[in-house]
Amino acid sequence: HVGADWQALVRHPAVDVVVECTGHPIAAVDHCLEAFAHGKHVVNVTVEADAFCGPLLARKAAQAGVLYSLAFGDQPALICDLVDWARTCGFPVVAAGRGHKWLPHFSESTPDTVWDNWGLTPEQAKRGGLNPKMFNSFLDGSKPAIESTAVANATGLTVPSDGLLYPPASIADIPRTPSITPRR
C-alpha cells in the first residue's frame, strides 16, 4: 500500500510490515512507535532514528510482540549479519566496523565544497539530483559514525568513550591497531 496518510497506512489491516524510509529521524521514531501500537512489524531504513533511539525502538517492538529490524542490504544491517554469523560460529566478537575512505581534510568539507572531493562539478551533481548534505555526511565521517552507532545498538557492542577515531589501517593492520582493538 502507498498513500499520503501515513497514519491510515499504519492502521490498515492488510499491512503487516511498515518500511520506514523517510530519512527524517524524528518522524521515523513517531512512525515506528505508531506501527508498533497497531501490531505492525517495522523495517527501519532511517538509520539516524536507530542511532539515536534504536534500543528504545527494539524494546517497544518487543513489548508490542512485533519485530523491529534494520534494512538488510544497507551497511549497518550487513555488519550486524556478520556479527551474528561470527557469534553463531562461536567466535567472540570484540569489535565491528566498516571501511571508510577518510582523509584529514575531509573534516573541513561542507555541502558547499563537497563536490570537489568527489571529482564532480556542482552542475553535474545538480543534474544527477545528488544531495550535497548527504554526500558530505559520507565524506566528513558523520554518516559512518551514525551507522556505527546503529551497529553498536543492534549488536550490544560498545563504542569508545573518546569517539570514533577512524585510524588508518588495512585489514591486516586491524588486530594491531590500538584504537580498534578492545582496551584492557
Regions found by a protein language model. Give the residues of each.
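A structured beta-alpha segment of the ubiquitous adenosine-cofactor-binding alpha/beta core
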Residues: H1-V17, T22-I26
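Conserved active-site and cofactor/substrate-binding residues in soluble primary-metabolism enzymes
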Residues: A4, P13, F52, G73, ...
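Rossmann-fold NAD(P)-binding glycine/threonine-rich loop
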Residues: T22-H38, V45-W85
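Short glycine/serine/threonine/alanine-rich loop segments
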Residues: K40, G65-L67, F91, L157
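Conserved anion/nucleotide-ligand pocket segment
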Residues: D81-V159
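Glycine-rich, aromatic-lined ligand/substrate-binding cores of catalytic
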Residues: P144-R184
